[in-house]
């Protein structure tokens, strides 16, 4: 969490160095939060410190290094391949998600405010794999579900736009949804990168070659990444609460 705070501070410094563009994009984003171009611009202007960290984490991982070297892109052809995969595969779930929301990979906004080519690719990669993450954790495209995805992205990347998007979305939430935020932060922490010996291994999402799982069972992706889908986590929490309540009643 301290690292994420450091990256947020770095984002503030980056925004200050590009203040006119940042203020213009931020203002337009507030008035029109579905304006992908301005939201993307804010994300890029505040990203430099986090992007450096993301690149280093990729360089220290075998899969991450391969991704940086080959620089795969998520395109409409990727979606076409996924749509041909049978039910039960990650690709089938991804294709269904994209079809339901009428999304196409080629519709992603290209990176325009990151000068370094490698860092620009890291940012583009994060942007293009966003819908893979939606599919992996089982979230749709409501404001509340988008917040859940952004929280996980923030814990894995430190990109300030993740936390800024969460803060900016709070006024649109109901009281119950606001109360749920504590659970969502807990879930994101449970699914944060983890390489501690004897615990569930969770790689940085930047080091996951999502495309390689399109023709594989969805459960294999979950097993290899160690990520717990949000609905599974909430069911587990509900079960533990019910068990604790039952034990309390029995103890009376």
Curated annotation (Swiss-Prot):
Keywords: Lyase, Membrane, Metal-binding, Mitochondrion, Mitochondrion inner membrane, Ubiquinone biosynthesis, Zinc
An example Gene Ontology CC term for this record: extrinsic component of mitochondrial inner membrane
Cofactor(s) needed for function: Zn(2+)
Subcellular location as annotated: Mitochondrion inner membrane
Stored Pfam families: Coq4
InterPro entries linked: Coq4, Coq4_euk
GO biological process, one term: ubiquinone biosynthetic process
Record bears the keyword Transferase: no
Enzyme Commission number(s) of this protein: 4.1.1.130
Principal location class: mitochondrion
Reaction(s) this enzyme catalyzes, per UniProt: a 4-hydroxy-3-methoxy-5-(all-trans-polyprenyl)benzoate + H(+) = a 2-methoxy-6-(all-trans-polyprenyl)phenol + CO2
Known role: Lyase that catalyzes the C1-decarboxylation of 4-hydroxy-3-methoxy-5-(all-trans-polyprenyl)benzoic acid into 2-methoxy-6-(all-trans-polyprenyl)phenol during ubiquinone biosynthesis.
Name used for this protein in its record: Ubiquinone biosynthesis protein COQ4 homolog 2, mitochondrial
